[in-house]
Amino acid sequence: MKKIILSVAIIATVITANAQSSKSDGSAIKFSAGLEVGLPVGDFKTISSIGFGASLQGEYAVSEKAGITLSAGYLSFSGKSIDLGGLGPVKYPSTSIVPILAGAKIYFSEKVYGHAQVGISIFNNGGGSAFTYAPAIGVMASENIDFSLKYQAATKSGGTISFLGLRAAYTF
């Protein structure tokens, strides 16, 4: 838990420091805070059900059509119960994920964009960490409202933990 808090604090410091220097020279940086819903896919769906969470993201505009992003979040997926017949039910534990990702956004139009991110996910209960990638498509519904749909996968030696995610965010 201390590593997670330290990682989020470092990211927030870097984004804030970058934002302060960027605004003074006229370039744009945006922040967003969002709520996320995740639907497990692949092997992950056999042990987990729907997940909920939140995320923070900073975006530095390198041009009118492209941006560099840095994000951190928290998602919690509840564990499923599976009936083993005569042995009774087995309840899988919940899975909590803290993704820390860097990426690039390409705007196809004023409202529609593609977003690719890579980084690390940290898991609860001594689950360690894993390389993570997350391609997404999104739409700016208004100047401050952002919706995106993503596929996020964390690859570990024991397999892949993946989900389809929907993010609704307020941009400021």
Which positions does each model-derived feature cover?
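Cleavable N-terminal export/targeting peptides
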Residues: 1-28
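Short glycine/proline- and aromatic-enriched beta-strand/turn motifs that initiate or cap beta-hairpins
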Residues: 20-65, 111, 161-172
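Predominantly the C-terminal beta-signal and adjacent terminal strand-loop region
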Residues: 24-26, 42, 74, 80-81, ...
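Detector for outer-membrane/organellar transmembrane beta-barrel domains
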Residues: 34, 59-79, 89, 95-103, ...
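Residues on the lipid-exposed face of transmembrane beta-strands in outer-membrane beta-barrel proteins
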Residues: 35-39, 54-60, 74, 100-106, ...
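Flexible, solvent-exposed loop segments that connect beta-strands
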Residues: 39-47, 76-96, 124-128, 157-159
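Repeated loop/turn-to-beta-strand initiation elements of outer-membrane beta-barrel proteins
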Residues: 65-68, 111-114, 141-149
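Mid-chain, well-packed structural core segment of small domains
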Residues: 107-127
